[in-house]
Design a protein with these regions (language model features):
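Glycine-rich, N-terminal phosphate-binding loop and its surrounding beta-alpha-beta segment
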Residues: 1-32
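Flexible, glycine/charged-enriched surface loops at secondary-structure junctions
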Residues: 69-76, 113-124, 156-167, 244-253
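Internal helix-turn-beta structural module
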Residues: 197-253
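Glycine-rich anion/phosphate-binding loop at the beta-strand->alpha-helix junction
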Residues: 117-212
Length: 253
């Protein structure tokens, strides 16, 4: 039976976006949506609005029921010019920082950006623990490829890497082969049972200046996007878990 969920939202004000009805914003889907469909909804970003991610979070909850022993964690390692010194996935930061000692500094930074109509991006780290072995396909449906696709579908996500990430560009083969941890829990596109580590890069919101002051525009989406990231990982891992289980169903004699 299909699962239906109704979410009522009264916390919206469409008139905040009236000034965008006749203009395109760089870095948004305004122009490309109109080019594709011949029309667009300018209110709050229309189909490309971050509000659509609520359905992903709801779906992620149901996916997590299939994976009761898998632990999904995420946190902000970089926000604008601020780099967290620690990588603590048990951080108590209300902003989602991996190092809660930077909370006050980040709050002050975001408030100053909000007042100036400025914005910033950053980096998020993800850890998936207790992922079953053998998930993913060897060629076209590699686990890292499907995770990358699902995570890059989140608005403003501009890059995804696994394990040592960008460090692979300068690591020698002899350095890489010493430890399978370098690959972040995925080898040859298939999970090896170790913790999966993912790095994501998010761009700054493109609406700045006076436009950012008039509508409902966040100076940074990172604190809000963490549940969405974890949900997309849950959905992808659940898909591959069910797929792998289908391979192991015993054929009748």
């Amino acid at each position: 039976t299909p699962i239906a969920v109704i979410v009522k939202n009264s916390n919206q004000k469409s008139s905040d976006y009236d000034q965008l009805k006749s203009e395109y914003r760089a870095g948004h889907a305004d122009k490309t949506t109109e080019l594709k469909y011949g029309h667009r909804d300018h209110r709050g970003g229309g189909r490309a609005s971050g509000r659509e991610t609520l359905s992903r979070v709801i779906g992620g909850y149901f996916a997590s029921l299939i994976l009761p022993n898998v632990i999904f964690s995420s946190g902000i390692s970089k926000l604008g010019p601020i780099h967290c010194n620690k990588k603590n996935f048990n951080s108590t930061s209300p902003l989602g920082l991996l190092d809660e000692s930077f909370d006050t500094k980040v709050e002050e930074l975001l408030l100053s950006y909000k007042e100036k109509g400025e914005s910033c991006g950053g980096e998020v780290l993800v850890k998936i623990q207790n992922c079953p072995q053998g998930l993913g396909e060897p060629v076209f449906d590699k686990l890292k490829a499907d995770l990358g696709k699902s995570l890059l579908s989140i608005g403003s996500c501009m890059g995804v890497s696994f394990g040592r990430g960008q460090d692979f560009a300068h690591l020698l083969g002899s350095d890489i082969s010493k430890d399978s941890d370098n690959f972040g829990g995925i080898e040859g596109g298939i999970s090896n049972g170790e913790d999966i580590f993912i790095q994501l890069v998010f761009k700054a919101p493109s609406t700045v200046g006076e436009k950012a002051k008039e509508g409902r525009h966040d100076p940074c989406i990172l604190p809000r996007v963490l549940p969405v990231i974890e949900s997309m990982c849950k959905l992808t891992i659940a898909d591959h878990f069910l797929r792998q289980n289908a391979y192991q169903i015993k054929k009748p004699d």
